[in-house]
Regions:
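Beta-rich carbohydrate-recognition and catalytic domains
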Residues: 14-184, 188-236, 245-295, 308-309
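Carbohydrate-binding surfaces of carbohydrate-active enzymes
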Residues: 304-306
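Calcium-binding acidic motifs and repeat modules
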Residues: 5
């Protein structure tokens, strides 16, 4: 099975925090109309100076991690960390954009907003084709971290192709008492006939693997903890467990975003190669850390769901 395409992080410009000597976005003389300066003000044109043309950007406000990326009936649905109220971090919700070619994107209404359990942190979305959760066949189920003083895992479901969501009345589906368990990435594991969730353990530098028959009731199966000799402390976020075919065998790759202490400066994306039996991920004995990208700010990239063998 070929792995789905990996989407790069869509965080805002952070290079100035790392590369303070020179930044062309700041030092280059302005020759065109600049972007709006007031927080939350919408651009009059998508062609203003410095507007990215390849990477998706919303018309206004704060954006970071891609979330819930799923392919449905010819349309790619990109959800993302979004602040509907301003240009700074906070009020985190799931923004939403759609595309048929992953080049031309149409911004949609905000899909999920903070509720009594907290802000809506990163997560994933699946198509429940066999109605395992009881929300209806082909319901789109979003799985995300409810973030307040504690980070717990919650779900919401959609009956209109991912346009609007209803939060599950039984949330949170995974309870937790601290702020170091987040970013659920979920896929269907055919061999065990269960949904598999990988969860980042933050500053514990590892991940947890959970399983469920129905997306509502979850069992913790194992932990994968790594202590890389000679590496300073860093947090783990946005894990993704991906199968690949290699020399006629299936191998599994775990990618995880770490911050700080990337390969150069700032953040980075590590990967581990190994095997997964439905409960445990076991890494091969390789010279870790291995890096997906050697730039200064590669972060929060994860794979698309429901793309078949692509």
């Amino acid at each position: 099975m070929a792995a789905a395409a990996i989407a790069a992080t869509i965080t805002g410009c952070t290079d100035y925090d790392i590369q303070q000597d020179y930044n062309p976005l700041i030092d280059k003389p302005q020759t065109e109309e600049p972007a709006p300066e007031q927080p939350g003000e919408e651009a009059n044109s998508r062609n203003e100076q410095y507007r990215p043309q390849i990477h998706y950007t919303p018309a206004k406000n704060w954006i970071n991690d891609p979330n819930g990326m799923i392919y449905l009936d010819g349309t790619y649905h990109l959800y993302y960390q979004y602040n509907p109220q301003g240009n700074g971090w906070g009020n985190l919700s799931w923004g939403h954009a759609t595309s048929t070619d992953m080049l031309h994107w149409e911004e949609q209404p905000v899909a999920l907003q903070p509720d009594a359990l907290g802000m809506i942190f990163s997560g994933s979305a699946v198509c429940d084709k066999d109605n395992t959760a009881g929300f209806g066949a082909n319901a789109i189920v979003a799985l995300y971290t409810s973030a307040s003083a504690a980070q717990q895992q919650s779900i919401a479901y959609s009956h209109d192709g991912g346009k609007t969501f209803t939060t599950y009345e039984g949330n949170p589906v995974i309870k937790n008492n601290d702020d170091n368990l987040r970013d659920p990435k979920v896929f269907w594991h055919e061999e065990s006939k269960k949904w598999i969730m990988s969860l980042a353990k933050g500053w514990a530098r590892g991940m947890e693997i959970w399983s469920s028959p129905d997306l509502k009731n979850w069992t913790k199966e194992s932990e994968f903890i790594v202590n890389l000799t000679g590496r300073p402390s860093f947090q783990w976020e946005c894990p993704d467990l991906i199968p690949f075919e290699y020399n006629g065998k299936r191998k599994w790759v775990l990618i995880v975003s770490v911050n700080p202490c990337g390969p150069v400066l700032g953040s980075g994306t590590m990967y581990f190669v190994g095997d997964f039996d439905g409960k445990h991920f076991t890494a091969d004995d390789l010279d870790y850390p291995l890096w997906l990208d050697y730039g200064m700010d590669n972060y929060a990239g994860v794979t698309w769901n429901n793309t078949g063998d692509r």
